[in-house]
């Protein structure tokens, strides 16, 4: 589910496999797409960046670095149009992540 960490940067390092990392604007449009583990070997996102990560390979592992102690995400830090993990529509949304490009928006999201 697309989310943000308002108070910390996030650094992603692929340990095994490849990962699609999508960044979004406040309205849910994709602003950036990176395949971590191909030509990109590390990705740092500023605090407050809306993003999601999808593993492209079975058994993929990514190392995340954030500042400070673990803080669970508040509902306000997840995109309301995206279903929570395990909810109806999750499989369709994850399939879309794999092919989505900058400028795209998830078709079934409320307008």
Q: Over which residues does each language-model region extend?
A:
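Double-stranded beta-helix
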Residues: 27-34, 52-111
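Histidine-centered metal-chelating micro-motifs
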Residues: 1, 40-43, 47-52, 70-71
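His/acidic/aromatic-lined binding-pocket segments of jelly-roll/cupin-type domains
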Residues: 3, 9-14, 43, 53
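Conserved short histidine dyad/triad with adjacent acidic residue
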Residues: 1-6, 36
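Generic beta-strand structural signal
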Residues: 10, 19, 41, 49-51, ...
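Glycine- and acidic-residue-biased ligand/ion/polar-headgroup-sensing regions
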Residues: 7-26
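Short acidic-glycine-tyrosine-enriched beta hairpin
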Residues: 11, 25-48
């Amino acid at each position: 589910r697309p989310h943000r960490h308002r108070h910390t940067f996030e650094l992603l390092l692929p340990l095994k496999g490849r990962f699609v990392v999508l960044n979004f604007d406040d309205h849910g449009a994709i602003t950036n797409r990176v395949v971590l583990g191909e030509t990109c070997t590390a990705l740092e996102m500023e605090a407050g960046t809306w993003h999601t990560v999808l593993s492209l390979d079975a058994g993929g592992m990514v190392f995340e670095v954030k500042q400070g102690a673990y803080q669970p995400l508040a509902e306000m830090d997840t995109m309301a149009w995206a279903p929570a993990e395990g909810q109806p529509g999750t499989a369709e949304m994850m399939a879309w992540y794999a092919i989505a490009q900058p400028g795209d928006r998830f078709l079934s999201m409320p307008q």
